[in-house]
Swiss-Prot record:
SUPFAM superfamilies named in the record: S-adenosyl-L-methionine-dependent methyltransferases
Catalysed reactions, semicolon-separated: guanosine(1207) in 16S rRNA + S-adenosyl-L-methionine = N(2)-methylguanosine(1207) in 16S rRNA + S-adenosyl-L-homocysteine + H(+)
Protein's UniProt name: Ribosomal RNA small subunit methyltransferase C
Quaternary assembly: Monomer.
PANTHER family: RIBOSOMAL RNA SMALL SUBUNIT METHYLTRANSFERASE C
GO terms assigned for molecular function: 16S rRNA (guanine(1207)-N(2))-methyltransferase activity; nucleic acid binding
Annotated function: Specifically methylates the guanine in position 1207 of 16S rRNA in the 30S particle.
EC class of the enzyme, as a word: transferase
Family: Belongs to the methyltransferase superfamily. RsmC family.
Compartment(s): Cytoplasm
Name of the coding gene: rsmC
The organism's taxonomic lineage, starting at the top: Bacteria, Pseudomonadati, Pseudomonadota, Gammaproteobacteria, Enterobacterales
Pfam families linked: MTS, MTS_N
Keywords, alphabetical: Cytoplasm, Methyltransferase, rRNA processing, S-adenosyl-L-methionine, Transferase
Alphabetized NCBIfam families for the sequence: PRK09489.1
Length: 347
């Protein structure tokens, strides 16, 4: 994330516009542009924990991580620079939140790659700000307007739910598998045929559906759920509460905030960061797993069949097995073995 994204490079083409402004950066911001940006004031709101980690080292308390921005975050800001995300519903949710807090008359800049659907920003905001496209470069569009009217925003109105068997799943915009259980997670769940117990870590927990389904089958599991997404963290907590299941839910960039070791780590790891393909999280998951598993502990993940995870698993664990597969997905499992005995040590 050290290099600038195409969207940030487009913003830099207009850097003179921002020198005297108090700028709020938000949305799918994936680089450190705010930390090196020349403006009268800089604030950042992000719902991605790993983006907060990157920026907080430089911007300290001027970076907020959370599901929604607060009045304190946007205080004194007269300009919004919003990075368009992959999910249109997530954009609607975030912009409704941000524009409900910003003052009428503030400048609104929306930037994003064309393939992300940023063109729909004009229509989406037509009732609140008249956007005009002011630049097109690096396969991105940059739009500008002024806030004419603050939208109303109620975060509670954005919750949705569905069921997986007897499990109630609570979801929010931007959460993976928001409308139904995805086929990869379904295949992963199918590999758990017998009840088990112990401590289990779900990395990239989404709405918490894996833990809640497995908790019905194996109620003695001690669960820890983690994700980088603030929306996923809140959705997991709501799903757990709806099903009367206790678990620890924390924000963590893979293992960054994970303490202790587990009997099992499960995951349906992402291979995108926003709209960009990225195997970073999955590579960190696999390479760091042995440091967070007991001897005999298992890493069980589901992934698209074409992704290069077998070699990573073999490098980290020495071997792996395929528990299930279909036309698109495979479920891999690798086990932590006992380290070889040092022949120089006495028994």
């Amino acid at each position: 994330m050290s290099a600038l994204t195409p969207a940030s490079e487009v913003i830099l083409r207009h850097s003179d516009e921002f020198i005297a402004r108090h700028v709020l950066f938000a949305g799918d911001l994936q680089d450190a542009l705010p930390a090196q940006f020349d403006a009268a004031g800089i604030r950042v709101h992000t719902n991605q924990y790993h983006h907060w980690q990157l920026l907080s080292n430089t911007l300290d308390e001027n970076v907020q991580f959370g599901l929604v921005a607060t009045p304190e975050t946007v205080a004194a800001c007269d300009t919004l620079v919003y990075y368009w995300p992959k999910s249109k519903q997530e954009a609607q949710f975030q912009l409704a939140n941000l524009l409900s807090l910003l003052p009428v008359g503030c400048d609104v800049f929306v930037v994003g790659e064309n393939r992300s659907g940023v063109r729909s920003a004009e229509e989406m905001l037509s009732g609140f700000a008249q956007l005009t496209k002011i630049d097109s470069a690096r396969r991105c569009g940059l739009y500008h307007g002024r806030l004419d009217k603050q939208p109303e925003f109620d975060a509670d109105a954005w919750w949705e739910s569905y069921q997986v068997g007897d499990v109630i799943v609570k979801t929010l915009p931007g959460v993976f598998s928001r409308d139904a259980l995805d086929s990869g997670s379904h295949l992963l769940l199918s590999t758990f045929s017998e009840p088990f117990k112990g401590s289990v870590l779900d990395v990239g927990c989404g709405a918490g559906v894996l833990a809640c389904v497995l908790a019905q089958q194996s109620p003695k599991i001690k669960w820890t759920l983690s994700d980088v997404s603030a929306a996923a963290i809140e959705a997991s907590r709501a799903t757990l509460a709806a099903n009367n299941i206790e678990a620890q839910v924390i924000a963590s960039n893979v293992y960054s905030d994970i303490k202790g070791r587990f009997e099992m780590i499960i995951s349906n790891p992402p291979f995108h960061d926003g709209i960009q393909t990225s195997l970073t999280a999955a590579e960190m998951l696999i390479r760091g797993a042995t440091a967070h598993l007991h001897v005999g502990g298992k890493l069980r993940i589901v992934a698209n069949s074409f992704l290069p995870y077998p070699a990573l698993l073999d490098a980290a664990f020495g071997s792996h097995e395929v528990l299930a597969q279909n036309g698109r997905f495979k479920v891999y499992q690798a086990t932590v073995g006992r380290p070889p005995r040092d022949p120089k040590k006495k028994r």
